[in-house]
Amino acid sequence: MAVPKRRNSKTRGAKRRTHYKIKLSSVIKCSNCGAYKRPHRVCPSCGEY
């Protein structure tokens, strides 16, 4: 059975977890109504593409 050979330090564990962050989705303003929407999707407020 696999067991850790040595204990990892707090810093090493934190460095490994730097890639666990949530990606921010890109948002743009709708050219029709000015509301924020995701690119290449229908605007939720006015329905314009």
From Swiss-Prot:
One of its GO terms (molecular function) is structural constituent of ribosome. It comes from the Bacteria. InterPro entries: Ribosomal_bL32, Ribosomal_bL32_bact, Ribosomal_zn-bd. Keywords: Ribonucleoprotein, Ribosomal protein. The keyword Ribosomal protein applies. GO terms for cellular component: large ribosomal subunit. Transmembrane segments: none annotated. Pfam families: Ribosomal_L32p. One of its GO terms (biological process) is translation. Belongs to the bacterial ribosomal protein bL32 family. PANTHER family: 50S RIBOSOMAL PROTEIN L32, LARGE RIBOSOMAL SUBUNIT PROTEIN BL32. This is Large ribosomal subunit protein bL32. It comes from Nautilia profundicola (strain ATCC BAA-1463 / DSM 18972 / AmH).
